[in-house]
């Protein structure tokens, strides 16, 4: 299940020190690697000055604000090592601060009231405010990711992420829905490795225990690419499609490769 990490440390650490410590870990951060940095992340949350300094620096250079930020606007990228891990701050607006005439439109920006999983493990800590409220379920099985597909969801807990509380979320296992903080403007800090290539991220309906849609678009682009290959490419690409159809991490991508093979190279499709 999603893990609340029992750490209680009053020491502090600088952001640069935290990044250096994490960088000394293995090239691909595992769950155990992330858990080994739980105390360090809490120490960073004890540092009440580093985020202020970062915000001031961003404000002084507002015209170049977060140009390399590939996430949505609630996220402030703080640093990390490209291709290995990122450290970021997530801003959580309380319900009263959501746009009065477009509150429903703002909720997806913060993933509020959207049950979703993640295609990466990550460690998080509350930094400011009483934090969002979250209901966490476990996806106990596998899913192909088709809209309306039934999944085996088991309720785990309903909790919050207040200051200094550390939690670990497991890729493709922990499914949660977040509700806006009741009163407090809140901030959390995250340590996360890159998404697992080929692993999907989904939205869910807890009441019906079904997948509602895919959350990310990269695999959809891969599927269109293979569709085009089946129409346009010569025989030099058939072995590549066969390899994708048997070994890619995404079932939907494997299926797209098999469709392309069946259309253009039906003999190879039998091997997929």
Predicted regions and their residues:
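A short, N-terminal "cap"/entry segment at the start of jelly-roll beta-barrel domains
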Residues: 4-99, 206
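Charged, amphipathic alpha-helical linkers/stalks
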Residues: 195-237
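Ligand-binding loop in jelly-roll beta-barrel domains
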Residues: 162, 171-191
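Amphipathic alpha-helical scaffolding segments comprising HEAT/armadillo-like alpha-solenoid repeats
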Residues: 207, 235-245, 267-272
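A short hydrophobic beta-strand segment most commonly corresponding to one strand
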Residues: 124, 134-136, 182-199
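Conserved short histidine dyad/triad with adjacent acidic residue
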Residues: 59-61, 89-120, 170-172
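Short acidic-glycine-tyrosine-enriched beta hairpin
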Residues: 118, 124, 140-171
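Conserved hydrophobic register position within alpha-solenoid helical repeats
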Residues: 222-228, 254-261, 272
């Amino acid at each position: 299940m999603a893990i609340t990490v029992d750490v209680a440390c009053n020491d502090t650490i600088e952001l640069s020190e935290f990044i250096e410590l994490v960088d000394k870990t293995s090239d691909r951060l595992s769950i155990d690697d992330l858990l080994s940095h739980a105390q360090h992340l809490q120490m960073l949350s004890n540092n009440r000055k580093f985020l202020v300094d970062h915000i001031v620096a961003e404000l002084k250079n507002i015209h170049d604000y977060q140009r390399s930020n590939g996430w949505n606007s609630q996220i402030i990228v703080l640093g990390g090592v490209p291709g290995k891990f990122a450290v970021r701050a997530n801003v959580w607006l309380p319900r009263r601060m959501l746009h009065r005439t477009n509150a429903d439109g703002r909720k997806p920006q913060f993933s509020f009231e959207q049950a979703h999983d993640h295609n990466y493990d990550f460690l998080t800590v509350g930094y400011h405010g009483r934090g969002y409220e979250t209901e966490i379920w476990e996806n106990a099985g596998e899913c192909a990711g088709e809209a309306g597909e039934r999944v085996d969801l088991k309720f785990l807990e309903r909790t919050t992420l207040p200051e200094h509380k550390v939690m670990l979320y497991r890729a493709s296992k922990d499914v949660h829905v977040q509700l806006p903080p009741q009163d407090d403007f809140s901030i959390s800090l995250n340590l996360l490795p890159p998404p697992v290539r080929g692993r999907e991220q989904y939205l869910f309906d807890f009441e019906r225990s079904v997948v509602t849609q895919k959350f990310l678009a990269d695999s959809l682009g891969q599927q269109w690419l293979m569709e085009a290959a089946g129409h346009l490419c010569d025989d030099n690409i058939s072995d590549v499609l066969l390899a994708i159809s048997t070994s890619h991490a995404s079932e939907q991508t494997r299926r797209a490769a098999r469709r392309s093979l069946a259309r253009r190279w039906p003999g190879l499709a039998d091997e997929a």
